[in-house]
């Protein structure tokens, strides 16, 4: 039998009943929307709690029938046959509820900012950064998420030295947050005549997109500089100082945007800065909350080598969970579900172990 936090379950059920009652009173639209959002969040949890309590009652009734010496043989036999089936159903429901009751990452439902930077490997690394961006772009398309490039710096022979994009949709961050880290590629470059395998790398950073309500940026904490935006060969894109550099003085974080519109550059630079500051706060809170946890998947260390894409063998290996898939082509086409589900499952297991440890 799985250990479940009974007090918390009772509190959630009581809160759910209060929300139901308040929604029935037809308050104003703004209050109703907030209540409906909380209702939608609690509904699957409370439904599972109620189903489990009903199941406990059925199991108790069957156990009473089996232990009662006055029960006729046929009734006892039926109860003995049904009991293991209900116990199996109970275990499955307890495990489902255990996952539903896990601590939620406040950023999970948010959109994300994805930053991909070519690392070691020169032009090959830039090409690989391009492959990674297209992989995420296709994955996003399969889920009807919107992708918008914020800024890019193209490689000499293709791909990107750096590309930053927003991926908008519900729950984007929950699916992509484990992509942060160093991605390594092993393949034979087209220019390689000797057939030698080259190793290159690109770094991925996935940040939850932050709203103004999530993180406050005080005007006195930032310095905004404008400068000439230059195109290829150092030519000025236009005659105005359109590039914007924003420095967050307390942390030293610097964001540069160099598109043609100065107004748009300022807005986008603030958007990226807000996301980075929010991510720092989120990581700090996570570390304080679970200082004892050593989950590699959840660490988000961007210097950590997390995955290798081996072209000659057609395989992808995620080093954090020791998972190897021999479907490199499909993964690069955006078929990431198997990898992402395995990473989420591993993270949930680590959280469950942490909860057991605290209990």
From Swiss-Prot:
Signal peptide: none annotated. PROSITE patterns: RF_PROK_I (PS00745). The keyword Cytoplasm applies. Keywords: Cytoplasm, Methylation, Protein biosynthesis. Its main location: cytoplasm. One of its GO terms (cellular component) is cytoplasm. Methylated by PrmC. Methylation increases the termination efficiency of RF1. The modification N5-methylglutamine is found at residue 235. Residues 284-308 are annotated as: Disordered. GO terms for molecular function: translation release factor activity, codon specific. The keyword 4Fe-4S does not apply. It is found in: Cytoplasm. NCBIfam families: prfA, PRK00591.1. Belongs to the prokaryotic/mitochondrial release factor family. Peptide chain release factor 1 directs the termination of translation in response to the peptide chain termination codons UAG and UAA. This is Peptide chain release factor 1. The lineage of its organism: Bacteria, Pseudomonadati, Pseudomonadota, Alphaproteobacteria, Hyphomicrobiales. The gene is prfA.
């Amino acid at each position: 039998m799985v250990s479940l936090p009974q007090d918390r379950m009772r509190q959630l059920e009581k809160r759910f009943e209060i929300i139901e009652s308040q929604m029935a009173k037809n308050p104003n639209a703004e209050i109703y929307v907030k209540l409906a959002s909380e209702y939608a969040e609690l509904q699957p949890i409370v439904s599972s709690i109620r189903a489990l309590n009903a199941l406990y009652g059925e199991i108790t009734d069957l156990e009473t029938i089996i232990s009662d010496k006055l029960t006729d043989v046929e009734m006892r036999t039926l109860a003995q046959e049904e009991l293991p089936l209900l116990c199996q159903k109970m275990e499955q429901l307890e495990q489902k509820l255990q996952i539903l009751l896990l601590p939620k990452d406040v950023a999970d439902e948010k959109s994300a900012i994805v930053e991909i930077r070519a690392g070691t490997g020169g032009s090959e690394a830039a090409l690989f950064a391009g492959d990674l961006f297209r992989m995420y772009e296709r994955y996003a398309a399969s889920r009807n998420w919107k992708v918008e490039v914020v800024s890019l710096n193209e490689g000499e022979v293709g791909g990107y030295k750096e590309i930053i994009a927003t991926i908008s949709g519900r729950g984007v961050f929950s699916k992509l947050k484990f992509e942060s880290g160093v991605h390594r590629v092993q393949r034979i470059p087209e220019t390689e005549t000797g057939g030698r395998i080259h190793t290159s790398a690109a770094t991925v950073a996935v940040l939850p997109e932050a709203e103004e309500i999530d993180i406050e940026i005080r005007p006195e904490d930032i310095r905004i500089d404008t400068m000439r935006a230059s195109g290829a060969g150092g030519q000025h894109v236009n005659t105005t100082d359109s590039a914007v550099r924003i420095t967050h003085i307390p942390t030293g974080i610097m964001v540069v945007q160099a598109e043609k519109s100065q107004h748009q550059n300022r807005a986008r630079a603030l958007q990226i800065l807000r996301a980075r500051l929010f991510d720092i706060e989120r990581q700090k809170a996570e570390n304080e909350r679970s200082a004892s946890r050593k989950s590699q998947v959840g660490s988000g260390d961007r210097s950590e080598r997390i995955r290798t894409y081996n072209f000659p063998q057609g395989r992808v290996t995620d080093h954090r969970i020791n998972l190897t898939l021999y479907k490199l082509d499909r993964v690069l086409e955006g078929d990431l579900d198997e990898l992402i589900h395995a990473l989420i499952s591993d993270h949930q297991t680590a959280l469950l172990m942490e909860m057991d440890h605290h209990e």
